[in-house]
């Protein structure tokens, strides 16, 4: 089985690696969902193209096993949803929540991500 990074890369999504990219996303838009928090920012014109996504879970989520399980679920949800609903030129950071990210049914996790992306990209009144 290929590593998770290459799974995201095959769908045209690259993974955020630098701390500065995560910090820039943290200062931009954010939208809470039942099982995760989604941060999003539109990149400047000179930056990389395409959709980029990062995943994080704090120690509040649990031990390393629980955090990695939550991130695997977020990674798979992003792989399924972002190619259709994500926008090129945007960075997304998916943050796992304690107990909800790992225990929520996967269909609910997908719905949470879709709803958060719709709200993030909705025109402001």
From Swiss-Prot:
GO terms for biological process, alphabetical: tRNA 5'-leader removal
Signal peptide: none
Keyword tRNA processing attached: yes
A cellular component annotation (GO) from this entry: ribonuclease P complex
UniProt cross-references to InterPro entries, sorted A to Z: Ribosomal_Su5_D2-typ_SF (IPR020568), Ribsml_uS5_D2-typ_fold_subgr (IPR014721), RNase_P (IPR000100), RNase_P_CS (IPR020539)
Reactions catalysed according to its record: Endonucleolytic cleavage of RNA, removing 5'-extranucleotides from tRNA precursor
Pfam families the record matches: Ribonuclease_P
GO terms for MF: 3'-tRNA processing endoribonuclease activity; ribonuclease P activity; tRNA binding
Keywords: Endonuclease, Hydrolase, Nuclease, RNA-binding, tRNA processing
EC number: 3.1.26.5
Oligomer and partners: Consists of a catalytic RNA component (M1 or rnpB) and a protein subunit.
Function: RNaseP catalyzes the removal of the 5'-leader sequence from pre-tRNA to produce the mature 5'-terminus. It can also cleave other RNA substrates such as 4.5S RNA. The protein component plays an auxiliary but essential role in vivo by binding to the 5'-leader sequence and broadening the substrate specificity of the ribozyme.
Protein family membership: Belongs to the RnpA family.
Name the record gives this protein: Ribonuclease P protein component
Provenance organism: Ruegeria pomeroyi (strain ATCC 700808 / DSM 15171 / DSS-3)
Gene name, Swiss-Prot/TrEMBL: rnpA
